[in-house]
């Protein structure tokens, strides 16, 4: 089913003479046969899920109509990726022959078209969508070395998109999201093949147009498959936000960018999208017939995830199944010169680093555990261990080697490096305490989403309007908001607040959820002591309490009271707070009792 994006043909057998068959594991008697089609209507190598008329129609079409032409090159990518992966997995030359033949056919066709026709085709919504075909063609070119294959990859250049992205000009408003995200992964592969800087610049700048400017808290992007204006988050939330394919392709792009620039922001995003949207897109039950993955993940109040989309078979079912095979593929990276090992994700895994003759075994229940242990096995080797310090790990990140603390100051959103000659049995223990925090919608600071470390917490409630929640009432001197929540016994990462249970977004249930809530702090309260004073706000929505707690962590109660007094004085001077109310606020802060 190519339209579902099931680009996974590695288990098919190939036989040009009698045909290879693959037995249907479901027992329904369906088999698969795939062989090279030398008798294509226009050129050898034609292999598609459509007749050639679909490709011809696309070339003459000036407007999109996916009921007549539905993305023939998108489907070609799925087939090409599948047969290419079959070759990479099995080294069966017949699979490579299929892939090469497909690209020979595409080059013979597309190279004859005027540039204006190509630009018009690739700019058409849906009909001109081609997914990750450029990446796949570049992968093939790396094997065959055929100049025609590299030239073919460049025939998919969408000049308006490349030029604007390379210049860091944001033109994403109104574009179909998943039609364009994988294009930039292809541009990175073209940069690898050609060294042309504008491809790298375009991909890097594009990523920055999505993260954070069009990103929901779970790492997803798009609403109704399309992007809206930059920095509009609250204004785009709907039942059709966060198409699952978009998260899949943003992970691929982030991973590929990291190959070129080892910036921790790419892996911070990777962790966010993987541990929230991607894990949460799969229902937590088995099914022999259906993949049970989401198409959209609605972020409206009380939304119930649909794991069997009413739209029928979707692209997201295919990428959803692929995602389940890729949980491990960005945990570790080695430096190009072999001098360092990057630990990007904290996930139970084992790395066999053959060049160094060592293994690294990671033992953890992260994110249900706030630590992990790396154990070196095999021989001994000298290298730098670069441990990602997540951007959310703002306090308490600690590393020990064989029980001894490693000196240094870990900086959130960076790598903490431990260099030594490693020997079998060495143990590296990493502790990273989680803190409760909020992230605010860029266009409405009162609309917020809740995180505990890397984990997005969602309220389970059938209410169809946003929950109204306050979090400052029991905030501790550290600024951690966690004391405002009550843990649920026997259910890791579950808490209650104001009578509502909050659970990890990644749990694939059919509970109605609230990913966003309305922040409501109507009165100034410290340590559960109510001053009786209304919590005033500036024109941008920032409240008095927001400004006070922005100074956290506080070394002592006295430091907090000093912050309260100086903030109150500024607000009184600005006419936002009366002198009498200001005195009440300071007095309440002085009398309250605080958690650490």
Q: Where are the predicted features?
A:
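Carbohydrate-binding/catalytic loop surfaces
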Residues: 45-70, 119-138, 167-189, 220-243, ...
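C-terminal beta-rich recognition modules with glycine/proline-rich loops and embedded aromatic residues
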Residues: 203, 267-283, 287-375, 411, ...
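Solvent-exposed beta-strand/loop surfaces of large extracellular or lumenal domains
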Residues: 394-419, 438-443
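Extended ligand-binding groove/face enriched in aromatic
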Residues: 37-155
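Extracytoplasmic low-complexity segments
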Residues: 1-40
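Well-ordered alpha-helical segments within folded domains of soluble proteins
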Residues: 71-87, 126-141, 175-192, 240-258, ...
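Long, well-ordered core segments of solenoidal/helical folds
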Residues: 37-45, 58, 97-114, 148-168, ...
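Soluble extracellular-acting proteins and domains
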Residues: 522-596
